[in-house]
């Protein structure tokens, strides 16, 4: 595992072996595809996680892949183990709450996507990203696919890897800050989480650019992360 102090990104190295993708969206020259997806854009606490997964068409498929949001936590864990064991390459990037507050959640997600693709660029010739935006500066050609986590198997796998990685971390953070019950809501804005914020105030894992956290801090103006002035994220903007 490598860490970059400049962007607080954690990249998990690739596993070996492979699985199969039958994506209906072909890429030029049959290049290996990196599916890319994120988990944790909306929560009030914790990092945003971005994963990239590369499939090998010569290997058997993993059955049961789906958008991580459609799977139970137990099923996600089962599929995660299969993905990381048999993937040709995979990577996970975590951008923490401090960096999210510095550059905003959108730019943090774009940064995570770029770092995740860089983590599999030694095998991937093309990246397919869930959503409608492609970050600038990717190491290979890419396209955005709206609803890709329900359409493309590589993106489904990435969504599972990102979600499981982040959920595991939030359970670890619960041990450090049990008063917020991060193990239950994973940092999302549930009534119990909002009540804990009002009672205890925010901890270092909370995103201070998000309106409910700002209100808990007693700030008069509650701004969302998108309203907060931000520094450029390593030159990251949208690809033209």
From Swiss-Prot:
Catalyzed reaction equations: Endonucleolytic cleavage to 5'-phosphomonoester
What is the top-level taxon of the source organism?
Bacteria
Q: Which cofactor does it need?
A: Mn(2+); Mg(2+)
Read off the Gene3D superfamilies from this record.
Answer: Ribonuclease H-like superfamily/Ribonuclease H (3.30.420.10)
Binding annotation for a divalent metal cation: 37-38, 130
| Location of this chain's protein in the cell | Cytoplasm
What is this protein's function per UniProt?
Answer: Endonuclease that specifically degrades the RNA of RNA-DNA hybrids.
- What protein family is recorded? Belongs to the RNase HII family.
Protein name stated in the entry:
Ribonuclease HII
Q: Which organism is it from?
A: Xanthomonas campestris pv. campestris (strain ATCC 33913 / DSM 3586 / NCPPB 528 / LMG 568 / P 25)
From the UniProt record, report the name of the gene that encodes this protein. Answer: rnhB
């Amino acid at each position: 595992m490598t860490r970059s102090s400049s962007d607080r990104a954690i990249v998990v190295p690739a596993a070996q072996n492979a699985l199969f993708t039958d994506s209906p969206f072909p890429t030029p020259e049959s290049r290996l595809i990196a599916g890319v997806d994120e988990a944790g854009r909306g929560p009030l606490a914790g990092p945003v996680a971005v994963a990239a997964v590369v499939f090998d068409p010569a290997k058997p498929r993993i059955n049961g892949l789906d958008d991580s949001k459609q799977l139970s936590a137990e099923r996600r864990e089962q599929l995660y183990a299969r993905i990381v064991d048999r993937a040709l390459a995979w990577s996970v990037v975590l951008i923490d709450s401090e960096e999210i507050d510095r550059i905003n959640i959108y730019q943090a997600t774009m940064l995570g996507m770029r770092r995740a693709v860089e983590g599999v660029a030694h095998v991937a010739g093309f990246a397919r990203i869930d959503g409608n935006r492609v970050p600038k500066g990717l190491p290979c050609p890419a396209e955005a696919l709206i609803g890709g986590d329900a359409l493309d198997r590589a993106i489904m796998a990435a969504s599972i890897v990102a979600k499981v990685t982040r959920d595991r971390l939030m359970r670890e953070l619960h041990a450090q800050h049990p008063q917020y019950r991060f193990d239950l809501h994973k940092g999302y804005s549930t009534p119990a989480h909002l009540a804990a914020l009002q009672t205890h105030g925010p901890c270092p894992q909370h995103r201070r650019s998000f309106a409910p956290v700002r209100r808990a801090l007693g700030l008069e103006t509650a701004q969302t992360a998108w309203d907060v002035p931000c520094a450029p994220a390593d030159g990251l903007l949208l690809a033209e």
